[in-house]
Every structure is written in structure tokens, then in C-alpha cells.
Amino acid sequence: MTLSCLLAFCGVSPMIAENLGNSQQKVIQPDLVGAKLIEVVAREYAPDQTLGYRKGRDILYSKVDNHDGILKGIYTDYSIELDPNSTEPRRIAYQQDINAEHIYPQSKGATGLAKSDLHNLYPSRIYVNSRRGNSPFAEIEDSQTEDWFRLDQTQETIPTTAINEYSEVTKTAFEPRESKEGDVARAVFYFYTIYKRQADARFFKSQQETLCQWNLTDPVDAGEIERSHRIAEYQGNENPFVVDSTLAERTYCFLQ
């Protein structure tokens, strides 16, 4: 793929080309694809530091995902009030049923410095976080869903309204609400790129095709870009898969 072709979005899906053309995004290393591109991105977008798990969660709740004193969980849009200047954001969040979800689970490689990498951490309703556990992400048939989650509610029956706003779970898989599927995909791509030596490769590959599809159907939006910027203020790095909408297709997706 040539530089001129990439800059014209050749071989890139129409949705991603439009998104890239109308945003603050850029094309990272436009002459590279595949393993070489992954290697360069891993080197150039590694965090300068991670904050430690306690401080990291405090920053997550009070600064990164706090918008005018409101903190929302990724999977259900459940929200709580939390003063961004609080000296105890972890305690306050926990008391109101919010804890930290590792998109790439701790048991699959999010340990050591990676445990507190904010690009892999999101607020979540505690029960929903627990129900997801370390299951891979997947498209779940409605008839196979065991429980549905939205806001502070859990139900066993198929929703009759706003079905796309629900996250779903089975014993072996988890599907986030549709508006966050792309966010989840790009967090997984980030983690597997930056921490490939410790990330469980079988776990990644078991969901790779689904994540590639979600990256297309739920493209990067302004809120995701702003979140990446906020994290960079504390870790010194952006999520490159948010910075560049072509990156997934040039690394893990079109090369499958």
C-alpha cells in the first residue's frame, strides 16, 4: 500500500475514510502495514509511565471519565455523581456501585505496569463487571443471552425497547452495548499491541474477527478522541487506534 494510496484512503472502508477525513485524526506511519507497523506503534505509543492501580483509578474516576461531576459506566451508561476534586474518588465510586473494568482482563495479561494503564481501564457497574469476568467479547444471539444490562437494571428477558442500549452476557461471552463496541475493540487492539509479550494471544485471536467488525460499525467519535487526550496528560501516550482510524485495518483486520 503506497503513501499516495493511503492518503487517499485507498483500501480503507468508506466509514473509516469519512471519519478520518472529518476529524482531528492522522495516519500513523502510512508506508507501513502488518508486523512492521505493529512493532513501530508498540515502540512509539508505549506509555511514559503508568500511575499505579490506586492512583490510576482515582484519575480515571475524577479526571478521565468524569464530565461535569458525572461518572458513567462503559457497559450500561449507569451514572453517579462524583466531584472531580474529591480526595476519595475510589471510595465514593465504589459506594455507588462503580469499579474499574479491565477491557483486556488481568487474568489474560493485564498485570504489572499494564494493570493500571488507563487506556485499558473503564468505569463499570460492579455487578456487570463481575458478570463479564474474563470472557471474550462476541456477538451474542438474542435467544442465547442469559442477562441484559442497562443503566442500573438487569433482566433475563429480551428487551422490547432500546435493545441496542443493553449489554449482554452468556456463560462464555460478553457483548457491550452497540455504542461502545468500537471503543472496546480499540482498547483491545491497544493492549495487545503495547503488551504483546504478556497478553494471552489465544484470548485475542478468539475475538479478533468480531473486534475488527466492531471497529468498522462503531467508528471513533469525538468523545473517544477527547478521552485519549485526557489519558495522555497523565501517561504521556495516546491510544494509536483512536488517533488513526486506518490502523486496525492495516494491522489486525484486513491482513487476517
Question: What do the predicted segments below correspond to?
Answer:
Residues P14-S79, L247-Q256:
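N-terminal module-boundary/linker segments of secreted carbohydrate-active enzymes
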Residues R90-N99, I103-Q256:
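Domain-level detector of nuclease and nuclease-like folds
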Residues G73-T87, S107-G112:
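Catalytic cores of extracellular degradative/oxidative enzymes
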